[in-house]
């Protein structure tokens, strides 16, 4: 689902963002690209073209774990009845 959307936006929208006109947005995308689903679907072609974005694999794994932590915390906040599972994952995250 995300794959065709990404290749579609890379043509125009994503390029304007990557031009460097908005550095904050670029940084945000770089942070997102190392976490969760964006690690796979977030502008891989742009990451290869620019020497800036690619993070070290170890840091990427750590960021992914960090994101998983945040995601589970958010899910716990939105689903209080899922409390026990959220707490287990939360403890596992910060081990």
Curated annotation (Swiss-Prot):
<protein>
    <recommendedName>
        <fullName>Homeotic protein bicoid</fullName>
    </recommendedName>
</protein>
<keyword id="KW-0804">Transcription</keyword>
<keyword id="KW-0805">Transcription regulation</keyword>
<keyword id="KW-0539">Nucleus</keyword>
<keyword id="KW-0238">DNA-binding</keyword>
<keyword id="KW-0217">Developmental protein</keyword>
<comment type="function">
    <text>Bicoid is polarity protein that provides positional cues for the development of head and thoracic segments. BCD regulates the expression of zygotic genes, possibly through its homeodomain, and inhibits the activity of other maternal gene products.</text>
</comment>
<feature type="region of interest" description="Disordered">
    <location>
        <begin position="1"/>
        <end position="29"/>
    </location>
</feature>
<comment type="similarity">
    <text>Belongs to the paired homeobox family. Bicoid subfamily.</text>
</comment>
<keyword id="KW-0371">Homeobox</keyword>
<feature type="region of interest" description="Disordered">
    <location>
        <begin position="42"/>
        <end position="63"/>
    </location>
</feature>
<dbReference type="GO" id="GO:0003677">
    <property type="term" value="F:DNA binding"/>
</dbReference>
<dbReference type="GO" id="GO:0005634">
    <property type="term" value="C:nucleus"/>
</dbReference>
<keyword id="KW-0694">RNA-binding</keyword>
<dbReference type="GO" id="GO:0003723">
    <property type="term" value="F:RNA binding"/>
</dbReference>
